[in-house]
């Protein structure tokens, strides 16, 4: 009573998304496996390529590490950089470390870092 792979695939293709999720969970329990992708295993193999990719990085994130001793000035600087409201900027500053801006150019990241450091913040560009 062997079931062909095609029959299994046809049956699965007619299932709802929730049914497929439940099926995957049941298979994980029955066979003691996980359907999660092994991302960490692939990372070491790309070690040599990662060095070259780091040199070509074009998008940067500006992260507020701490607001230092002048929180009000840092909040004002964050508001002018991000166009956030007062409450949102205050929450961002008080929630340090937190990203101020993400996916920006190197020049823009350096300019934002300069503005925030002048206001008294500790900044990290990633």
Curated annotation (Swiss-Prot):
Pfam families: Ribosomal_L12, Ribosomal_L12_N. GO terms for molecular function: mRNA binding; structural constituent of ribosome. One of its GO terms (biological process) is translation. Disulfide bonds: none annotated. The keyword NAD does not apply. Keywords: Ribonucleoprotein, Ribosomal protein. GO terms for cellular component: cytosolic large ribosomal subunit. InterPro entries: Ribosomal_bL12 (IPR000206), Ribosomal_bL12_C (IPR013823), Ribosomal_bL12_C/ClpS-like (IPR014719), Ribosomal_bL12_oligo (IPR008932), Ribosomal_bL12_oligo_N_sf (IPR036235). The keyword Ribonucleoprotein applies. Belongs to the bacterial ribosomal protein bL12 family. Forms part of the ribosomal stalk which helps the ribosome interact with GTP-bound translation factors. Is thus essential for accurate translation. Homodimer. Part of the ribosomal stalk of the 50S ribosomal subunit. Forms a multimeric L10(L12)X complex, where L10 forms an elongated spine to which 2 to 4 L12 dimers bind in a sequential fashion. Binds GTP-bound translation factors. NCBIfam families: L12. This is Large ribosomal subunit protein bL12.
């Amino acid at each position: 009573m062997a079931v062909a792979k095609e029959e299994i695939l046809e049956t699965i293709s007619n299932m709802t998304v929730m049914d497929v999720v439940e099926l995957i969970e049941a298979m994980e329990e029955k066979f003691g496996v996980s359907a999660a992708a092994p991302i960490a295993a692939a990372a070491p193999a790309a070690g040599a390529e990662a060095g070259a990719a780091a040199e070509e990085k074009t998008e940067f994130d500006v992260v507020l590490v701490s607001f230092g001793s002048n929180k009000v000035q840092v909040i004002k600087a964050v508001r002018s950089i991000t166009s956030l409201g007062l409450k949102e900027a205050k929450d961002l500053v008080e929630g340090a470390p937190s990203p101020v801006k993400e996916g920006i150019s190197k020049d823009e990241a350096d300019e934002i870092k300069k503005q925030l450091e002048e206001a008294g913040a500790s900044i990290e560009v990633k």
